[in-house]
């Protein structure tokens, strides 16, 4: 089978040096040889851990937040949640297992561009055909109660390759998706910004600088690099439009300003993961390791509400769930049944999710739909 390395080399031989954004796109999402197509995934048996893989507590908190937003919306009979970058469906399973109050109204859409990851959804989730699941949804300006008559009760779960186009407000969730979108690299030189590209030199892949077509508006030292977050900005705009008036976009990820990123070594904020080992050569082993890049906040749609994951989880009730877990554990520890084990697990999971030196330091970005 053709490898990503071979595809990149052939592309350079044909066109000359290619943008880093294109290299990352091929490395992660090439339909046959890309990282996700060839088995790369989150999870303890995969290549990296995200909050949903820590355990079901994260999904239980998300379920509580969905209930809050559903009630704020007046408890509509149809409540659409779109999880973008759903991976193997771990978060969706945890949300549904928490049995949120909005379940009967819930239309949960998993969006995952990797066919290999998407194929895993049906293994643990009862999926419905999208055309049937949303055929009777109300129009944007329609009456929820009247228009939803005859719709089957939720939760209805759908798996798609791309963001859908649905009427009415939606909640769009993205956990560690933005850092997995293709990104460019810009470097400050004596004469201004230059774009970093990948070229061939004597059979080796090397970085070269070419005049930048667009560059970040930030003053940094010569030699400093910043990401170019054009693809992230496009995705956020599309998600805000999908959420619609009354909806919201919630993205959880690594994030910092371009100036802060420029002050650090670029290989500190461009990360690679393979079998839970972090690497330091993003453009080697193409297609066999995950490549992520911290989100440059000042380069994307302005105005999000920003909080740390730790603060956000506390605001949405994680401590109540942990207290409930402690109570169940004390009541059932002597029995040692599954309920006791799950309850005890909440305490351990919360420590990881709230860790200020780890997952708790992630940024939660929230935009209103429009």
Model regions: which residues?
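Conserved protein kinase catalytic core
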Residues: 118, 181-182, 259
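Rossmann-like AdoMet
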Residues: 1-84, 88-162, 166, 317-320, ...
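A short SAM/SAH-binding and catalytic strip from SAM-dependent methyltransferases
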Residues: 158-190, 226-230, 234, 238-243, ...
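Long, Lys/Arg- and hydrophobic-enriched amphipathic alpha-helices
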Residues: 214-370
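Short, glycine/acidic-enriched loop or turn micro-motifs at the edges of active sites
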Residues: 86, 115, 178, 256, ...
């Amino acid at each position: 089978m053709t490898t990503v390395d071979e595809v990149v080399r052939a592309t350079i031989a044909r066109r000359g040096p290619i943008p880093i954004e294109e290299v990352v796109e091929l490395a992660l999402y090439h339909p046959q040889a890309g990282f996700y197509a060839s088995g790369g995934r989150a999870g303890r048996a995969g290549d990296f851990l995200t909050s949903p893989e820590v355990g079901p507590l994260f999904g239980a908190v998300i379920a509580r937040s969905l209930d809050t937003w559903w009630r704020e919306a007046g408890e509509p009979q149809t409540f659409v949640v779109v999880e973008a970058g759903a991976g193997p469906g771990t978060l969706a399973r945890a949300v549904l297992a928490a049995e949120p109050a909005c379940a009967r109204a819930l239309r949960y859409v998993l969006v995952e561009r990797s066919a290999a990851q998407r194929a895993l959804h049906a293994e643990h989730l009862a999926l419905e055909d999208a055309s049937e699941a949303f055929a009777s949804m109300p129009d944007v300006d329609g009456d929820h109660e009247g228009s939803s008559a005859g719709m089957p009760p939720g939760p209805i779960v759908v798996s798609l390759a791309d963001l859908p186009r649905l009427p009415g407000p939606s909640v769009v969730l993205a956990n560690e998706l933005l850092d997995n979108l293709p990104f460019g690299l810009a470097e400050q030189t004596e004469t201004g910004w230059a774009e970093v590209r990948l070229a061939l030199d004597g059979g080796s892949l090397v970085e070269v600088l070419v005049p930048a077509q667009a560059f970040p508006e930030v003053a940094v030292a010569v030699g400093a690099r910043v990401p170019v977050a054009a693809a992230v900005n496009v995705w956020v705009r599309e998600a805000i439009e999908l959420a619609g008036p009354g909806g919201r976009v919630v993205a959880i990820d690594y994030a910092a300003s371009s100036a802060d990123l420029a002050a650090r070594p670029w290989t500190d904020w461009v990360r690679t993961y393979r079998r839970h080992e972090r690497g330091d050569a993003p453009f080697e082993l193409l297609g066999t390791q995950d490549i992520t890049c911290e989100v440059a906040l000042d380069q994307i749609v302005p105005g999000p509400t920003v909080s740390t994951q730790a603060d956000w989880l506390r605001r949405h009730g994680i401590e109540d769930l942990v207290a409930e877990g402690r109570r169940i554990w004390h009541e059932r520890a002597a029995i040692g049944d599954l309920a006791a084990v799950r309850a005890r697990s909440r305490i351990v999971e919360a420590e990881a999710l709230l860790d200020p030196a780890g997952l708790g330091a992630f940024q939660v970005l929230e935009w209103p739909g429009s």
